[in-house]
Curated annotation (Swiss-Prot):
One of its GO terms (cellular component) is ribosome. GO terms for molecular function: structural constituent of ribosome. Belongs to the universal ribosomal protein uL16 family. Component of the small ribosomal subunit. Mature ribosomes consist of a small (40S) and a large (60S) subunit. The 40S subunit contains about 33 different proteins and 1 molecule of RNA (18S). The 60S subunit contains about 49 different proteins and 3 molecules of RNA (25S, 5.8S and 5S). The gene is RPL10. It comes from Solanum melongena (Eggplant). The lineage of its organism: Eukaryota, Viridiplantae, Streptophyta, Embryophyta, Tracheophyta. Transmembrane segments: none annotated. Keywords: Ribonucleoprotein, Ribosomal protein. GO terms for biological process: translation. PROSITE patterns: RIBOSOMAL_L10E. Changing residue 80 to T: In clone TM002. This is Large ribosomal subunit protein uL16.
Length: 219
């Protein structure tokens, strides 16, 4: 018996049903890798960022997430190069899908009980996605911005419903806009933290600081 189509589980109708000690025997998700490409590149290397944003409230299967990741990674590797981008899958499939298997052979009505006790067994997992939630994000150099948008356009065909490709105003995966990031960097108030960055704050009263030492040092 083949896998039931994901269109049967697309609508969010019930509560979250995660894997737990009450819900056992859940098959592993098809997607196992959520960061692809140069994930160790510093925050200054890739300033451009583009998102694939869901425009519907729906369930997205782990198979669809894996197919979209492969499509996006394949195009970016071919067009921009394998060390020219960082792709991140932003949703995780934690919701368990159930199936109440029905026999369709001759004499099946004597072997099964129909809809009596129809809770079902775990069949797969999916991610519960809201409107405006980011599905995939790609950061790269400004020269590869068109390649990143085309890669997300191709990944969009792997998902049900509607999605939009939105170019971020932020610097990479950080929460700072481009102008703010460059301004803080010129003032030595930004400390790189992997793919992100930390902003140094002002600790203590300014009156207790020495002249010219209003901000903490980056060391």
């Amino acid at each position: 018996m083949g896998r039931r189509p994901a269109r049967c589980y697309r609508q969010i109708k019930n509560k979250p049903y995660p894997k737990s000690r009450f819900c056992r025997g859940v098959p592993d998700p098809k997607i196992r890798i959520y960061d692809v490409g140069m994930k160790r590149k510093g925050v200054d290397e890739f300033p451009f960022c583009v998102h694939l944003v869901s425009w519907e409230k729906e369930n997205v299967s782990s198979e669809a997430l894996e197919a979209a990741r492969i499509a996006c990674n394949k195009y970016m590797t071919k067009s921009a190069g394998k060390d020219a981008f960082h792709l991140r899958v932003r949703v995780h499939p934690f919701h368990v899908l159930r199936i109440n298997k029905m026999l369709s052979c001759a004499g099946a009505d004597r072997l099964q009980t129909g809809m009596r006790g129809a809770f079902g067994k775990p069949q797969g997992v999916c991610a519960r996605v809201a409107i405006g939630q980011v599905l995939l994000s790609v950061r790269c150099k400004d020269g590869n911005s068109n390649h990143a948008q085309e890669a997300l356009r191709r990944a969009k065909f792997k998902f049900p419903g509607r999605q939009k490709i939105i170019v971020s105003r932020k610097w990479g995966f950080t929460k700072f806009s481009r102008t703010d990031y460059l301004k803080y960097k010129s003032e030595n108030r930004i400390v790189p933290d992997g793919v992100n960055a930390k902003l140094l704050g002002n600790h203590g009263p300014l009156a207790a600081r020495q002249p010219g030492r209003a901000f903490l040092s980056s060391s």
